[in-house]
């Protein structure tokens, strides 16, 4: 019986010796993970169809809203431009006005730029208009177009 145990122990020891190198080996490899997010900047402009009370004037009347979405990590720019250089026109007659859009307030005599320092998602800003009251405006239908 002792011989049997000795042979069994020897066989087990040999099997372990051959298995040990396989368990001791340490193999590794690498897997690279890659992906890309495309730049996507969009705006949705909603014209509220408001009529301005020119004779009585308007103070920060909301005339539209803009929803901005841009995933640029370095930010982006929003531009505001007036077709009539910041004036409501009726033929040759004009009425000055000012706009307020987020951090910009002023006349759109030239293109205005609002800088965004980082990405924004569904950022909503209202476009507001201020028109001074006057009894001396000339009769007519006045209009301008603001492009965002």
Identify the function of each model-found stretch.
Residues 3-4, 17, 75, 92, ...:
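Intrinsic disorder/low-structure terminal segments
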Residues 24-90, 111-148:
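N-terminal small/polar-rich segments of proteins
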Residues 89-109:
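Extracellular/luminal ectodomains and secreted, surface-exposed scaffolds of diverse proteins
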């Amino acid at each position: 019986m002792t011989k049997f145990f000795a042979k069994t122990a020897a066989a087990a020891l040999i099997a372990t010796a051959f298995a040990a190198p396989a368990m001791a080996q340490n193999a590794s490899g690498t897997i690279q993970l890659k992906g890309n997010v495309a730049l996507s900047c969009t705006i949705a402009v909603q014209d509220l169809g408001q009529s301005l009370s020119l004779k009585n004037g308007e103070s920060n009347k909301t005339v539209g809203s803009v929803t901005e979405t841009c995933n640029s990590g370095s930010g982006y720019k929003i531009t505001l431009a007036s077709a009539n250089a910041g004036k409501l026109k009726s033929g040759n007659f004009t009425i000055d006005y000012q706009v307020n859009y987020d951090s910009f307030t002023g006349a759109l005599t030239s293109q205005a730029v609002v800088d965004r320092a980082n990405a924004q998602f569904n950022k909503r800003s209202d476009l507001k208009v201020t028109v001074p009251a006057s009894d001396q405006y000339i009769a007519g239908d006045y209009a301008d177009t603001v492009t965002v």
